[in-house]
């Protein structure tokens, strides 16, 4: 019989033991018996006597195997990305060949071979490290990197449970020693700026300082990834910075982002059980690029893809085939048992359940996958941003053709102004404007009450689907020099620096808006200086250092400056429009600087309204009143004579159309109010002209 401890020599000693009230017997060779009885625990009394023999029951081969299975510190704190790449757990990396090649070049160096990936959040820095792991797994790397393994270090786990002084340094030293021994390991540290200051407390060394000597000599290799803003923390420590070689990661173009999504869509289709059409892939990129301004491609496009797949997956009444098959087997057994027991009622119920389950299983197998289309992506963008993307995308070409007619319906008597605005917007939508300039920048000049603000509201409704898409700033709030800072936020060191600017933050959140600055001549001249850059380059930097794009906004400023001045023309001149425009610019030059006026796409003069225009405006105002009454189930009928009388009563050459609203309130709405209070069961109102006076009749 062989020895139960070494399994090699013949057993010569039979040993009987009782350990913790359990009787055990084993056979040993003389060598193993002498080895076990010499252990110090043998002299520590009967309870500890059995301890070495308890271990003796385990074969030496097994204990050696356990030693080999024991993982090092690196395996506890880091994850092997290369193994994940070999197992197919990593998404394919597309369009980043140049960056991956640059990383491989740096890793191939003799010293300071530590690349750090720097770029904005969401541009794909971690994906480049995963791309390197895929290339290593495929063997598509130089000979020096053939057998390398890429480990992702968890910095939080590195610092955890190191509360006692010296524990962190000891753990770092152990990690560095292990990395020096395992020459085939490349350490990837995401958010590498966390190394600066990690683990330091009251004079102890931080992770960055501990790693410096090993990084400089090339004893271990590290790949880092961080954002531009957070890389400054590493730049403060010049000695640490020089040990890293920066690799800039730029945001991919729209074409590259589409290729990236087409490459990874198979993974998302398999996960969600849906299919993505090519139009949906394109919509993910184009819509996220256009409407989600504060994030970067391809991350924001992948988020849309994932969310659309998730939403479509929830609509599928999915049946698990394995569970259904197991239940069918169980039903068959239960049905057989019920028949044996002559329980025919239960057997009939089980038969019905079996038929229903088979039918559902067959329909599930024949079920075609749900396809995600571009419309689904539009719905998600609308939910995330609040921008009516569907309205903006639908029949845009037709909408642009009809823009001028739609504006004329609401803005009366300003044909030239409406025509100029419509032309500028159509030119922009056709892609003929400068890439970064706003859609249009206009200065509306004219007397009060002629439709300057109304044109802005109508334009917002036609362009962006809602009249609420207006960011309106009252220039009377910006008459003082110090108030100008409210537009972009207070500078550092001043109260309110943490708060966002009134204009920049609104445009950042709602880039598709009309910015309306009423009575611009009231504002301090510094406001004009601030808008010089917006109208020229379509961008403005707020007090937090964030650049806000105005390329999707329409800038409209209104002014009464010079509206009351008329110049007499002397002599003969065929082109009156040239003289009028020159006269207008000359009068505005008294209030605004030439460089400010020169940046507008168009300076539009609004004419004073004539009596015939006021009748149309009365019809519009009464139409609004009719809609209000319709909500209460009351109809309204107004004769043409009554409309003309209202226009006559409300006409004032200096005040424009605003007196009309007051006239309607005085002659129509007040009469209706009295009638409603006297008789609550009114179904219709008739406004007529009787004895040259406006009368309201109720039915």
From Swiss-Prot:
The cross-references to PANTHER family, in alphabetical order and at most eight, read:
ATP-DEPENDENT CLP PROTEASE, ATP-DEPENDENT CLP PROTEASE, ATP-BINDING SUBUNIT CLPC
Report the stretches of sequence that form zinc fingers (C4-type): 3-32
The UniProt entry's sequence similarity note says: Belongs to the ClpA/ClpB family. ClpE subfamily.
Q: Which SMART domains match?
A: AAA (SM00382), ClpB_D2-small (SM01086)
Alphabetically ordered keywords of this record:
ATP-binding, Chaperone, Metal-binding, Nucleotide-binding, Stress response, Zinc, Zinc-finger
Could you say which residues bind ATP here?
Answer: 119-126, 446-453
Gene3D superfamilies reported in the protein's UniProt record: 1.10.8.60, P-loop containing nucleotide triphosphate hydrolases, UVR domain
Ranges where the UVR domain occurs: 325-360
Protein name (record): ATP-dependent Clp protease ATP-binding subunit ClpE
Q: Which InterPro entries match?
A: AAA+_ATPase, ATPase_AAA_core, Clp_ATPase_C, ClpA/B, ClpA/B_CS1, ClpA/B_CS2, ClpA/ClpB_AAA_lid, ClpA_ClpB
**Subunit notes for this chain?**
Interacts with ClpP.
Source organism of this protein record: Bacillus subtilis (strain 168)
Provide the induction entry: By heat shock via the relief of repression carried out by the transcriptional regulator CtsR.
Q: What is the reported phenotype of gene knockout?
A: Cells lacking this gene display a retardation of CtsR-dependent gene induction as well as a delayed restoration of the repressed stage. They also show a significant delay in disaggregation of heat-generated insoluble protein aggregates.
Q: Fill in the PTM field for this protein.
A: ClpE is a very short-lived protein, that is, at least in the soluble cell fraction, degraded mainly by ClpCP.
Listed Pfam families? AAA, AAA_2, AAA_lid_9, ClpB_D2-small
List the GO molecular function terms.
Answer: ATP binding; ATP hydrolysis activity; zinc ion binding
